[in-house]
Amino acid sequence: MQTKKEALLARLRGEKADFIPEIWTGHKQIVFPGERYFGPNNQLDPYGTGPDAWGVMWTNMGPNPAVDGNTVAKGYKMFDNMDEWKEHVKFPPLDFMPIEQILQGMCHMMQVDREQEAVSCLMMSGTFERMNQLIGFENALCAFYEYPDEVHEFFDAMCEYKLKCIDLTYKYLKPDIIHMHDDWGTNDNMFFSPEIWREFIKPIEKRLADRIHEYGMIYMHHSCGFIQQIIPDLVEIGVDAINPMMVKNDIDYVMEHYGDKITVVGGLDNQFMERPGTTEEEIRAEVRSKMDKYVNKGRYIPFIIPNSERVLGIYADEVTRYGMEIEIK
């Protein structure tokens, strides 16, 4: 029988796994420093506001960042337009940050067992996210049309920064998975056209994918919402897994056409599971039905982004239990 680590890595690579792993409890995720403000003490100040390493102000939405999340402080903008970015943006000084101590300290705190558990490093605030965190969402969307040259320049600079983050992460942590984070879609469509994504973002993602693979690591990309139009592009540039594939995407279509080329992490009806009044058995039934439907259609791992400890606990228990029972052909 494979370990949790072996089963998860096999499923992410498209190899045979002995069972279906549960990601939240099945591996340890280390967060690369500098991209968020988590507060001096979330228990004492769960709704505190403070700066990340870029100077962007964040407000925590509760005491548990993994569930409660955080958001850019209401009304905050560092500046207004991308023709000003060189005057205002100061990239975090990676050479002077205690990256090794932070990453290793997180491993120690989380009691990582590298023999039994896969390790990922979450790198938040990708190119588009960082732009909208600096100048606001509306300004960021307009910038593709108003300041295309400046956006290209900023994204190229962001790419160099992220490449260095990857280099340092491999040097000091050597994780199995790099989990890049850049949201590109609403519930029903992408924030921008696929053509905009292909011009501005796809070349950056290709460089990141290549560097991650040079080190022998797996590239899992986080993007909430509807991104079905660019799944073939993600396959083309070498993304190994997309997380979370939400149900507004046509999961049946994605699994039929790309299920042997990219791992679909998700596929559960997050909104139904989190709805007030949804019972424990309904949550468990949703997990089982999607596992029955997709596990043998390709590279599939069930997953949700939880908004409550209750749903997370029920979901994780059902995936863990049923993942050992379901027949994998």
Positions of PLM-derived features:
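Glycine/serine-rich loop-strand microenvironments at binding/catalytic pocket rims
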Residues: 46-58, 63-67, 247, 253-267
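Active-site loop segments of alpha/beta catalytic cores
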Residues: 1-27, 90-329
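Short aromatic-enriched loop/helix-cap "lid" or pocket-rim segments at secondary-structure transitions
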Residues: 33-36, 62-66, 71, 132-133, ...
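A contiguous, low-structure linker/loop signature
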Residues: 49-100, 112-120
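N-terminal accessory/capping or targeting/presequence segment of soluble
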Residues: 13-15, 20-57, 61
